[in-house]
Amino acid sequence: MASASASKYNSHSLENESIKKVSQDGVSQDVSETVPRLPGELLITEKEVIYICPFNGPIKGRVYITNYRLYLRSLETDSALILDVPLGVISRIEKMGGATSRGENSYGLDITCKDLRNLRFALKQEGHSRRDMFEILVKHAFPLAHNLPLFAFVNEEKFNVDGWTVYNPVEEYRRQGLPNHHWRISFINKCYELCETYPALLVVPYRTSDDDLRRIATFRSRNRLPVLSWIHPENKMVIMRCSQPLVGMSGKRNKDDEKYLDVIRETNKQTSKLMIYDARPSVNAVANKATGGGYESDDAYQNSELSFLDIHNIHVMRESLKKVKDIVYPNIEESHWLSSLESTHWLEHIKLVLTGAIQVADQVSSGKSSVLVHCSDGWDRTAQLTSLAMLMLDSFYRTIEGFEILVQKEWISFGHKFASRIGHGDKNHADADRSPIFLQFIDCVWQMSKQFPTAFEFNEGFLITVLDHLYSCRFGTFLFNCDSARERQKLTERTVSLWSLINSNKDKFKNPFYTKEINRVLYPVASMRHLELWVNYYIRWNPRVKQQQPNPVEQRYMELLALRDDYIKRLEELQLANSAKLADAPASTSSSSQMVPHVQTHF
């Protein structure tokens, strides 16, 4: 599978050009070998190494290290292996063996990646070969520790569409029918003074003043007060999001917060209560009181109903993914596969997230009540639940553009801590803030797409591309923890958006079986019998596991679509040429030319 991923990150128009090399005097040179490169990508060094392939044994090759990637090409005639690894994917680099190591290929480097693979290279002991490669890799894989920019800030790629324009919050809320006589758009956070990790634009109840919002924010963790994410187009029930209330051990109350939740409930006269979904296990919510947090009590919030969804915290999810990696890479133990997969608890966590989102979606769709969703700080499990519920409820988010907007809105603008959870350019691989929360969300989306194969405009390749560039640092889309930090860094001016890449070649990411349905609500089956491990993502690096290929019907359908597009294009060219001939014909023939029928296509 290594070779299959060789050109994954290549800029299509440049993938056969030679890479630039920076010599010691700073002059760019050309390297004779053809290595894929991106505009702004420079070669730092190259070395002959032995790649210790976990599947095929030692392979002699040449490794090229640029300011964006590690690229290995086999030098052996019987092996066409190529490795193409963005440096942003690297989590840890360790030296293997010492000066006294005598075993074959026992001296070199071990590289741990964030995308569930490890790389091992053996090097010669003489000439500081390992030291040089180690220092260069550490410097460019973890640029933040060396006062270097992430590659996104030197990437000079150009696309024919600007992905930064995909999401406009005013336009998105207008699509939802907002503002209206119950809800208003507030710019109280335009300078990020109310809440540093919230977007500049917030939708809040019409009856609540900005002064009220300031008082309410003081009673919510990180000032992340309840704000609107989505409104049902017919019954007008809403999905709100926030962080936990600052109740503490003494059971503190805040009349402004209590009144605010009543105002939210009263925006819809069809219901007498507000449903609060706390994503945490109840024992965790109680424990958070010791650190000043907590949950909404029945006494304080009498017109609300509280339900705990039992989704575990970031540390549990991190350990679960580590266990997944242990069973899928490099070797898979067939005889104990099911018990090994069960021991990771990964699919159980996926089930709980999906189950929670289904409850949120059903509560709103059925018109039972509006809902308020929170966890502890409201930027991890909360984002999973609101975005998945919105995906189930609103078919627009199941289009390519709609999904991009959903990610920009519920994850990026509302402050999911991408920099902390992924560790972009950071060498601290053991950081307790690292966690695969966004990966879990994408996994849930994939599970839904398997159960509803015609409901999503995008295909599996789209989801994998999003995850690959979650780590790559090629684009600015997932950099930093919140919008305030992105604005300080002028991210939209200095980097390229991932959506530019995707939207400039949408056909590559389209699901051929997609059927547009405006008002269809999706309720996936969240049982262990219907959930499965995403083989094409988690086990894609193992060549011994056959990847799930598109079925022949899908392949033939794609071929027919391409054939149709080709015929339509040729027909349009013929019609254009015919129109030009008719325009140039003498006036005397104009009457007879009107007898020529206009050809139409029935594709």
Curated annotation (Swiss-Prot):
It comes from the Eukaryota. InterPro entries: GRAM, Myotubularin, Myotubularin-like_Pase_dom, PH-like_dom_sf, Prot-tyrosine_phosphatase-like, Tyr_Pase_AS, Tyr_Pase_cat, Tyr_Pase_dom. SUPFAM superfamilies: (Phosphotyrosine protein) phosphatases II, PH domain-like. It is a peripheral membrane protein. Residues 29-97 form the GRAM domain. Widely expressed with highest levels detected in heart and muscle and low levels in brain (at protein level). Expressed in skeletal muscles (at protein level). Disruption phenotype: Mice are viable although lifespan is severely reduced. An under-representation of mutant males suggests some prenatal lethality. Generalized and progressive myopathy starts at around 4 weeks of age with amyotrophy and accumulation of central nuclei in skeletal muscle fibers, leading to death at 6-14 weeks. Mutants also show mitochondrial disorganization and increased levels of desmin with abnormal desmin intermediate filament formation and architecture. It is found in: Cytoplasm; Cell membrane; Cell projection, Filopodium; Cell projection, Ruffle. One of its GO terms (cellular component) is filopodium. Keywords: Cell membrane, Cell projection, Cytoplasm, Endosome, Hydrolase, Lipid metabolism, Membrane, Phosphoprotein, Protein phosphatase, Protein transport, Transport. A 1,2-diacyl-sn-glycero-3-phospho-(1D-myo-inositol-3-phosphate) binds at N288, N313, I314, S376, D377, G378, W379, D380, R381, R421. CDD domains: PTP-MTM1. SMART domains: GRAM, PTPc_motif. A 1,2-diacyl-sn-glycero-3-phospho-(1D-myo-inositol-3,5-bisphosphate) binds at N288, N313, I314, S376, D377, G378, W379, D380, R381, K417, R421. Heterodimer with MTMR12. Interacts with KMT2A/MLL1 (via SET domain). Interacts with DES in skeletal muscle but not in cardiac muscle. Interacts with SPEG. Lipid phosphatase which dephosphorylates phosphatidylinositol 3-monophosphate (PI3P) and phosphatidylinositol 3,5-bisphosphate (PI(3,5)P2). Has also been shown to dephosphorylate phosphotyrosine- and phosphoserine-containing peptides. Negatively regulates EGFR degradation through regulation of EGFR trafficking from the late endosome to the lysosome. Plays a role in vacuolar formation and morphology. Regulates desmin intermediate filament assembly and architecture. Plays a role in mitochondrial morphology and positioning. Required for skeletal muscle maintenance but not for myogenesis. This is Myotubularin. It comes from Mus musculus (Mouse). The lineage of its organism: Eukaryota, Metazoa, Chordata, Craniata, Vertebrata. The gene is Mtm1.
